[in-house]
Amino acid sequence: MQKMMLRIKFRYAFYGKTEHSFESGIMKIKVIQRDTEVQMKEIKLKAMAKINLGLDVTRKREDGYHEVRMIMQSINMYDQIRLSPLEEPQIRVKTNVSFLPVNEDNLVYKAAKLLMDEFQVTSGVEIDLRKFIPTAAGMGGGSSDAAAVLVGVNRMFQLGLTKRELMERSVAIGADVPFCVLRGTALAEGIGEILTPLPSLPKCFV
């Protein structure tokens, strides 16, 4: 199986907008037609939780990270995210959980800013985050939320990034985010950013 090698360091570049779009994970899209441009009105996504089916810590690196080998699996528990465009150049976050930050300390904010800065997006986005995945439970809630926002921002502003390109960028947010973009079943190595997709497992209760 071909491994997806994701580098932590990458160069930012400006890419022109394109009609190509990445749709994985999108539940519902509302659009309005204005002249020849299609503008996204609202995008709703599911941010799937994940569990580790096995974990082997192989060594501690000089940068403080641990090298690992583990099987990661998406499960049918998810947060709900709604993205709405804003005319003003800002990122606005709201959530149903009072103790979560709604500024740049939230991973969904960081995810949106990552792409919007790189592609010099001049408008804004509102992120409505409905949390159902337990926080700080090792189920990848924050990472999955960030991954879903990357997918949504890519679609909303028609940035044309492929899944691999989203995964390459997402490692700058967190080691688990690339898997949350990929989803499914995968062998994770390195600090979790080197992913080998595996065959889907039979459905079961966790």
Residue ranges of each PLM-predicted region?
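Methionine residue identity
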Residues: 1-5, 27
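Short hydrophobic alpha-helical segments enriched in small aliphatic residues
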Residues: 13-16
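N-terminal, positively charged, Ser/Thr/Ala/Gly-biased leader segments
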Residues: 29-91
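ATP-dependent small-molecule kinase catalytic core of the GHMP/sugar-kinase superfamily
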Residues: 41-46, 52-56, 60-70, 159-206
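Glycine-rich, flexible beta-strand/loop modules in the N-terminal catalytic cores of phosphate-handling
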Residues: 74, 79-115
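Helix-rich "cap/lid" substructures immediately adjacent to catalytic or cofactor-binding pockets
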Residues: 103-133
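DPxDG-like acidic metal-binding loop motif
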Residues: 108, 137-165, 179
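Phosphate-handling active-site elements
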Residues: 117-128, 152-170
